[in-house]
Amino acid sequence: MAQISSNSGFKECPSSHPEPTRAKDVDKEEALQMEAEALAKLQKDRQVTDNQRGFELSSSTRKKAQVYNKQDYDLMVFPESDSQKRALDIDVEKLTQAELEKLLLDDSFETKKTPVLPVTPILSPSFSAQLYFRPTIQRGQWPPGLPGPSTYALPSIYPSTYSKQAAFQNGFNPRMPTFPSTEPIYLSLPGQSPYFSYPLTPATPFHPQGSLPIYRPVVSTDMAKLFDKIASTSEFLKNGKARTDLEITDSKVSNLQVSPKSEDISKFDWLDLDPLSKPKVDNVEVLDHEEEKNVSSLLAKDPWDAVLLEERSTANCHLERKVNGKSLSVATVTRSQSLNIRTTQLAKAQGHISQKDPNGTSSLPTGSSLLQEVEVQNEEMAAFCRSITKLKTKFPYTNHRTNPGYLLSPVTAQRNICGENASVKVSIDIEGFQLPVTFTCDVSSTVEIIIMQALCWVHDDLNQVDVGSYVLKVCGQEEVLQNNHCLGSHEHIQNCRKWDTEIRLQLLTFSAMCQNLARTAEDDETPVDLNKHLYQIEKPCKEAMTRHPVEELLDSYHNQVELALQIENQHRAVDQVIKAVRKICSALDGVETLAITESVKKLKRAVNLPRSKTADVTSLFGGEDTSRSSTRGSLNPENPVQVSINQLTAAIYDLLRLHANSGRSPTDCAQSSKSVKEAWTTTEQLQFTIFAAHGISSNWVSNYEKYYLICSLSHNGKDLFKPIQSKKVGTYKNFFYLIKWDELIIFPIQISQLPLESVLHLTLFGILNQSSGSSPDSNKQRKGPEALGKVSLPLFDFKRFLTCGTKLLYLWTSSHTNSVPGTVTKKGYVMERIVLQVDFPSPAFDIIYTTPQVDRSIIQQHNLETLENDIKGKLLDILHKDSSLGLSKEDKAFLWEKRYYCFKHPNCLPKILASAPNWKWVNLAKTYSLLHQWPALYPLIALELLDSKFADQEVRSLAVTWIEAISDDELTDLLPQFVQALKYEIYLNSSLVQFLLSRALGNIQIAHNLYWLLKDALHDVQFSTRYEHVLGALLSVGGKRLREELLKQTKLVQLLGGVAEKVRQASGSARQVVLQRSMERVQSFFQKNKCRLPLKPSLVAKELNIKSCSFFSSNAVPLKVTMVNADPMGEEINVMFKVGEDLRQDMLALQMIKIMDKIWLKEGLDLRMVIFKCLSTGRDRGMVELVPASDTLRKIQVEYGVTGSFKDKPLAEWLRKYNPSEEEYEKASENFIYSCAGCCVATYVLGICDRHNDNIMLRSTGHMFHIDFGKFLGHAQMFGSFKRDRAPFVLTSDMAYVINGGEKPTIRFQLFVDLCCQAYNLIRKQTNLFLNLLSLMIPSGLPELTSIQDLKYVRDALQPQTTDAEATIFFTRLIESSLGSIATKFNFFIHNLAQLRFSGLPSNDEPILSFSPKTYSFRQDGRIKEVSVFTYHKKYNPDKHYIYVVRILREGQIEPSFVFRTFDEFQELHNKLSIIFPLWKLPGFPNRMVLGRTHIKDVAAKRKIELNSYLQSLMNASTDVAECDLVCTFFHPLLRDEKAEGIARSADAGSFSPTPGQIGGAVKLSISYRNGTLFIMVMHIKDLVTEDGADPNPYVKTYLLPDNHKTSKRKTKISRKTRNPTFNEMLVYSGYSKETLRQRELQLSVLSAESLRENFFLGGVTLPLKDFNLSKETVKWYQLTAATYL
C-alpha cells in the first residue's frame, strides 16, 4: 500500500500475472453456477494447505519470496475480452445513472489492472496496521501517499509493513510493482486495532498462539468505487437502498479507522436491487451490521468479498497534516482485506461456540489460555537468568573461601604499619577459661601470630594444632578478623585505639563460629528466579500487568456480557459492560485503543435500537448467507448488541496481547524468518512516529494548555544532533484523557552511522494554561514551559537488533497536585506515570549491529621523546591535567592525534577515549585495537570508564576487567557509585552486573550493602525495572539464609518507619505515649526474631530497650532506638531512625569523608576522624549511627547563656569537665586539633554549607565531627539575599582557644595549620578520583548534584593546577579568613535564639552545671553549716585569671574543706537558680559591669567581698533554694579542688622574662628552585623573645647577598601580637640561574613592627645557598641568632 522510492537498493519484482485466456461466452445463470463451484474448490484447497502448514512460518526467505511471486488468479475467466478493451476507456465519473446500473451487470467491466497489494509479509506483533487500512488521520510510521487511485506496490524481497511518503529520502522506489500471492499471510494476532500499544519492559508478556490468513481481494478499487456510485443512483434509492444518516456517519468513521474486524463489509447489499429483499429504512438509526459482523472462517468469500468503501467527501475525509513543512493527504480508498478473524467467544458469553473452526484454525484464545502467556519471560530476561545461573555455578556452597557464612572485619591499609612501634593490650576469651587471656602485642603483628600466642595458653605443642582452623571473633559483633592482615589494619582495632577502649576478642574454631548466613546444597540446586523473592519488597512504582488481576477483570467483563445478553432491559447491563471495559483499560495504564473506543460507541448505538427493528436488522444476516456462515463455523449473531460485544471483546484481547508484547526484541516473538541486514550497510535515516500519551490526569487538563515533546539522540552522554521539537497539541477525552500528536520525527542520520549504544530521549513539556485559575502557581503566567518528565529508549536491543514496531514507554513525571494517586515525593509533588506510544518502522528485514573485526596486529608505539619540545610540552601538560573535564576541543583533537605517543602514560586512557572525535562503526576497529593493547589501569583509574562519557560496551567491559583487581573492602566503600553506574549500562546483562553479583556471592558484607543500595534505587522510576531485575538476581543467588535475614531487616525498617511517622504526626505532649505504645509492636517482632542491624550487619539485636527509646526535638522528630545486643559481651546498640528527610546526600558526604580519611591513613596521617554510618532505607527515611558521649556545640555554648557562641572558653571548659586531669585534657586537646583539621579540609573540599552549632558535635574525648549534610557542593543556605555561610569553613575563636591552649597563638596552632595544609595537599593529588566518584552519582537524583556543573565547585576548591607550596599558602589564607569571620559567630547566635529551649532542670543524663559532670545532693555530701569566700588566687591556664577559694564546713566535720570557683562559675549558679526558681526572691548577684581590665587584683578583692555576701544571703534563703541539688553540686569538690598544686600558683608562673638582649626562637622555611626561579616560603616562627616580655608584631624580611642596592628585599605581612606567628607566604626571586645562586647567601631577619617606636630586631639567620640541593624542595627549622641584618 505504500509508495516506495527508487533509491532503496532493493530489486524490483515485476508482476508475473499472466493474461487471462479467452473462453466461450456463457449466460448469467451459468456464470453464477461456475462461480459457486470455484468458491467451493478454493475453500477445499486452502483448508488442505492450512492443515499442512499448521500455521507455521515458511522456513526460508527464498521459499517465501517464491510464494510472493505467484499471482492470485481470478476464480473464473469470462470471454468478454472486447468489452474489457472498451471498458479501459470508460470514464466512470461521466456515466449516467442508467448507464451505471446497466454497467453493473456487464461482467467485463473489471479489466486487468495493476493488482492491489494482495498480501503482507509475515509480521511480528509490532507490525503497522496501515498495511491493511488507511485512516484519514495518520497513525503509522510513514506519511500516506497522495490522494487518488494510486497504486501501492511492494517488492517481494522487501515486504514493507508501512506506507511511505512519495518524495521522502528513504531510498525506496515508488515505481516498483506489487507482488501478488496465493499464499495466505499469517498474522500473530487475531485482530488489529487501528493503533495499539506496548509496555516498555513487560515482566509477563503474551505470546501469540494462532496465525491468521489474509486473502487478496478479488474486487479492485475501481470496481468498489463503481458499485458504491451505483448504490447512490435514483433507481437504487427508489428501491429503498439508500443509507440512513447514521449509516453514512458510520461509514465515514469506518474509513477513518477501519478495524481488522471489519472484513465483513456488505457483500451483496449493493448488488441486491430487489426492493422486497430487505426492509425499507426511513429515518431510523440502524447499525452498519456489516462493519460489526464477526465472521470466523477461512473459506473464500463472494467475488465481491473485499470491496473497499469510498470516502464521501474530500472535505470530511481527506485530512491533511504537515510533515517537514509539506502538507500530505491520506489516500482516499481503504479496504478490509477480507481479514477473517477467528473470534471465539468465551463460553460465558456464547457457550455454543467451538474453539476451532471446521478448518482447524485456532480461534481467539479463551481468557485462561491467553492469560497464561502473561507469565512467560521475554528473551532478554531469559538470557539474563541463564547468565546468572552460569555465574552461580562458579561459587559452590562447598567453597569455604567464598561461602564462609560470616562477615570479615574490614581492613584499611596504613603506611608503614608493619614498622610502627606501637603496642596494644589485647584480651582474648578462650573456651574453658574463666578469665580472658591478656597480653601486649604490636599492631604490626598479623592476626595469625596473635592466634598462635593465644593458643600457647591452651596447647603445649603448637605443632599438633592447625592454626589456620582458628579465627578471632570481635566480642559483641558477628565478625571475624582476617588472619592474613596486620592487627592494626582492621577498622575495629583502629576504632578501639581511637576511642581508647579495650580490645576484646574471642578465639573460636571454624566449626564453632556461627555460620548462619552460608549457602547450602539446596541453594545451589534452586533455579534462578528474578521475581520469586521480590514479593516482600516495597516497590514504589506500579508493577507490570500480571495474569491474575487481569483474569479477574476479564471474568468480571464476561459476567457482565452474559448478563447483558440475557436480560430484557439491556441499557443498564451494557453500562456495566462498558464500566468493566474501562477497568481493564485502566489496569493497562489507561491505554485505550481506537478499536475499543469505536466498539464502545457502536455498542451504545446498538442498545438504543428499537426492538421492532432488531428483527429487521437481524434479517440482514439471514437467508442464504446464514447457512453459509454456519458452514464456516462462524457465530450467527442474533442482534446488534451481540455483534458489537463480539467486536468489543476482540478489541480487548488485542489490547492485552499488544500491551504484553511491547518492548520485546524483534526476535523475541515468533520464530521470525526475516532476513537480516547489517546496520553499517543501511543508509535509511532514523525515523519514528510519536503517536500519543495515554493516562493523562485531569489536573494536567486544567493546568496545561498545550504539550510538546523534545526528541534527542545521545551517545556518551552527549547529543548526536540538535534535539527536535514536536508540534504543540492539546488533550482528548474518551475513557481517559490522552495527548495525541501522530507526528513523524526524522533524524538526519543514517542508521549506518548510529553507534550501538545510541539512546533516544523523549522529554515531555507542558505549556501552562494562561486562563486557568486553579493552578497552585500564582506566577505561572510568567513561567515558560515546564518539563514534565523524560523517558529513554536504546535504539538497539540486547541482541543488537534495531528497535521496530510500536513501543509503550513509561514516563514518570512530577505534578503540582495532591489529588492524583501516585508515588508521593518530596516537596509535595506526586509522581504520575503516563504511557507514551511511539511507532517505529517495521521493515521486512531485521537490522543488526555487528561488531567490526578488531585488528590484532601490534600497534606501533611512538616514542614521546622524538617529538619536538613544544609539542612534547603541550602533550605532557594535557596528560598531567587532573581530569578530562577541563579539556578544550583543541586539546582533545591534539591528544587524539598523538594517542600513540601515550602508551607510557597509561592513566591518560580516559582522556584519550573522551577525546575520540566519534564512535561510528567505521572507526571502531582502530579504537578497539588501541584499547586491547593498552597497559592495564589501576582499578580506581579504570572507574572513570564507567561514567556516562563512555557508553561503548567494549570499553566498559574492559574497564570492569581491570576493576576486578580491587579488594572487597575497597569495593564496599565505592559500592554506591557502582550501583549508579548500572544506569549507564545499555543492557541488563552487562559485565558490571556480573562483577557485582560475583563479589556479592563471595562476600556477605558486599551482598548486604548491595541489597540496601538496590532497594533504595527502586525509587528511581526511570530505572526501577532494571534495579528490580538485579535485586531479584541477588536474592536468588545469595541463598535462603541471607535472603531471610535481609527480609527481616526490611520488616524491622518498615515497623520503625511506621512508629516514626506516628510520633512525628502526634502533638508534642502525646509523642512519648505514642512512642511507647508503638514500640510494643516492634518488640513483638523481636520476640520472634533476632535481627542484624541494617547499618552494620555484624551487630545482632535480640530485643528493644523500650525505656531507653526516645525521640529528638528537631523538625523531623527522629527516633532514638535502643536495642539489646544478642551477644552478651556486647554493648547496647543505639541508632537514630529518621523519616521526612532524604539521607542519600548524607550518605554521599560521609562516604567522601571516609575515603578522605583512608587516603590520609595510607599516607601515614591519622587525623582521628569520627566516621559514623548512615543508611537510606527508603524514600525520605533512613538510619543513622549515634556517636556516644557527644554533644552539639550549641548545647555546650548555651550553658554559658544565649551569647555563649561569642565566648572563647566554653569548648575548653567542657573538655576539662570530662577530662579533669592534665594528661586527659592534653590528650583531648590533641584529638580536637587533629579532628578539627580534618573537618576543616573535608567540609571545604566538599563545599558543605549550612554549618551552625547544632550540626557540629564534640565528643568528650575531644573528637570533633559534623552531622547533617543537607547542603553541599557550595549550595549555601541563604539568609534573605545573603549566604549564611560566609566563611570557607567553620573555625571559631572558641575552637582556636582549644587549639592554642589559650587566647594567644602558640606552636599548637602552627601544628593545626600544618595538618590542614598536609591533608589538603594529599586530597589534591586525588582530584580525579573525587571528581569521578561525584560524577558517577549525578544520576542518583540528589537535589544538589544534578549536572557536571555542580562538580565545578570541587574542582575549583582543590586547585589541581597549583603546586603544593601554592596550595599551602592558599589554605593558610582560608584559615585566617575563617578564624576572623564574625559571620560564623553571628550565625551561631541566631541559631541559639531559634533553638534555645530551657524547661527547668536538665534530664537526668545531663550535667546540671557545666563544670560538674554529675549532679549531687546533700544526702550524699552532708548539710553545710558554714560557707564563706576565704581568699583568692591568681592562676594561669594558660591565661591569667583569678580563682576564689570557698571555705566549707559540713555537719559532722571538724576540718573545713576548700573548693575553687571562678567568677563565671558563680554567675552560672545564679543564672540557673533564677531559671529553676523564677517566683522566688533570690539574693542579688554582683554582676555590675567593670570598665577596663577584669583580671586584676583590685577587681578580685572587691569581688571577694561581694561574693561572700552573696553566699551568706543564699544560705539564709528558703530551704528549697539553699538545699537544692544545684547548690549542693556547686559546692561538691572536683578533682581540681583535691589536687595540691591547684590550690595556689605563683603569680608569675609560666611567664617568661628574658634578660636584656636575649634572642630566641626558630623559623621554618621551604626552599625550592624551578624554572629559573627561587622560591622561599616562610612557614612558621616559634618561641620568639622580647626584652620587655610583651607580645611582638613579627614579620620577616629577606635579602640575597651581596646586594649593595637592596634590590632583593622581600617582606611578609605582619602578624599581630604573637610569639608564634604562622605566615605560609611565598617570597619569589626570579631570573637567577643555579650557578648565580650558588654564589649568594639568603639573609633572613625577623622584626617586630611598632607604631610608636622604631621596629626592633627579634633574630635572624644567614643561609649560604651553595649548601642546598636546589633540584628538590628543602623544608627545615632554622634557629634564629643575633646576626647582623640590612
Curated annotation (Swiss-Prot):
SMART domains cross-referenced by the UniProt entry? C2 (SM00239), PI3K_C2 (SM00142), PI3K_rbd (SM00144), PI3Ka (SM00145), PI3Kc (SM00146), PX (SM00312)
Which PROSITE patterns does the record cross-reference, listed alphabetically? C2, C2_PI3K, PI3_4_KINASE_1, PI3_4_KINASE_2, PI3_4_KINASE_3, PI3K_RBD, PIK_HELICAL, PX
Question: Per the entry, what modulates this protein's activity?
Answer: Activated by insulin. Only slightly inhibited by wortmannin and LY294002. Activated by clathrin.
Which GO terms of the molecular function aspect are on file?
A: 1-phosphatidylinositol-3-kinase activity; 1-phosphatidylinositol-4,5-bisphosphate 3-kinase activity; 1-phosphatidylinositol-4-phosphate 3-kinase activity; ATP binding; clathrin binding; phosphatidylinositol binding
Q: What class of enzyme is it?
A: transferase
Q: Which residues carry this modification: Phosphoserine?
A: S60, S108, S259, S327, S338, S630, S1281, S1553
Q: Where is this region: Interaction with PtdIns(4,5)P2-containing membranes?
A: 1488-1493
Instruction: Tell me which residues make up the C2 PI3K-type domain.
Output: 682-841
Any note on cofactor binding?
A: Ca(2+) or Mg(2+). Mn(2+) cannot be used.
One of its GO biological process terms is: exocytosis
Q: Where is the composition biased (Basic and acidic residues)?
A: 19-31
Activation loop: where is this region?
1266-1292
Q: Cross-referenced InterPro entries, in alphabetical order?
A: ARM-type_fold, C2_dom, C2_domain_sf, Kinase-like_dom_sf, PI3/4_kinase_cat_dom, PI3/4_kinase_cat_sf, PI3/4_kinase_CS, PI3K-C2-alpha_dom
User: Which UniProt keywords are present, listed alphabetically?
Assistant: Acetylation, ATP-binding, Cataract, Cell membrane, Cytoplasm, Cytoplasmic vesicle, Disease variant, Dwarfism, Endocytosis, Exocytosis, Golgi apparatus, Kinase, Lipid metabolism, Membrane, Nucleotide-binding, Nucleus, Phosphoprotein, Transferase
In chain numbering, motif Nuclear localization signal lies across 1608-1619
GO (cellular component) term, any one: cytosol
Q: What is its main location?
A: membrane
Noted disease: Oculoskeletodental syndrome: An autosomal recessive syndrome characterized by congenital cataracts, short stature, dysmorphic features with coarse facies, dental anomalies, multiple skeletal abnormalities, and neurological manifestations. Other recurrent features include hearing loss, secondary glaucoma, and nephrocalcinosis.
The annotated subunit structure for this chain is: Part of a complex with ERBB2 and EGFR. Interacts with clathrin trimers. Interacts with SBF2/MTMR13.
Protein name as catalogued? Phosphatidylinositol 4-phosphate 3-kinase C2 domain-containing subunit alpha
